[in-house]
Amino acid sequence: MNNSLSIWTKLHHQAVELAQAEPMLSSHYHQHIINHDDFASALACHLAAQLGGESVSSLALERLFLSILGEQPNIIESALQDMEAYYQRDPACDNYCRPFLFFKGFLAIQSQRLAHALWHRERHSLARYIQHKVSLLCCCDIHPAAQLGSGLMVDHATGLVIGETAEVGNNVSLLHGVTLGGSGNDVGKRHPTIGDDVMISAGAKVLGNITVGKGSKVGAGSVVLNAVPAHVTVAGVPAKIVGRLSDKTPSLSIDQDISH
């Protein structure tokens, strides 16, 4: 909890500084961060502003999101861990405001977390609406039923696809163009399970009801059709094991070199 408060305090402080440094964005920083008393309020406001429109009120969405966050504080904690993941792993992220306001991967993941909550409340149409809006805004498609862990970094996000029965563990890094897809029209569990600390590089496709083991790395452009053990690197089409990792958390280093 103390760390969560610390991240919110830093986010708020940085927003004040950035608003002073760039007056044209001052209202933007105030509306989405500075005017709020806590992270949940800021997050609900920011997401609702992006996802609302002529037919769906942003204010109504904001109230709904606040209600969900109040009932499921784990979503708030996951969002904070995601923001920390960007700050620690992405060299282009030099403050917390960057992912919160400007990184579409962060927007897509937090929107899916709320859509996931709605999905489990049998509000499937609204969850699908959020999925649709995120697809239009962020050029990625994440099913509301997909299960996502915490501490996720989705870099760039363009072209990302995560299917309905996919499961993604904690502290995972996904780069642009990644697909966690099915391998046919089977019903039931048909998408991959991604273990903790996994890094999946740009353009990689992981297909079917298979598991990518903890702390593994998938090389860029690979097509993974079979289960991957823990702590290995796989690459190629179809992907094969090309090495064993001494780095147990490749998702943190974001090293796409498959030779080590």
Name each model-derived stretch:
Residues L114, R123, N171-G181, D196-D197, ...:
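A signal for specific C-terminal beta-sheet/loop modules enriched in small/flexible residues
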Residues M1-K133, L252-H260:
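Terminal amphipathic alpha-helical/low-complexity segments used for targeting or macromolecular assembly
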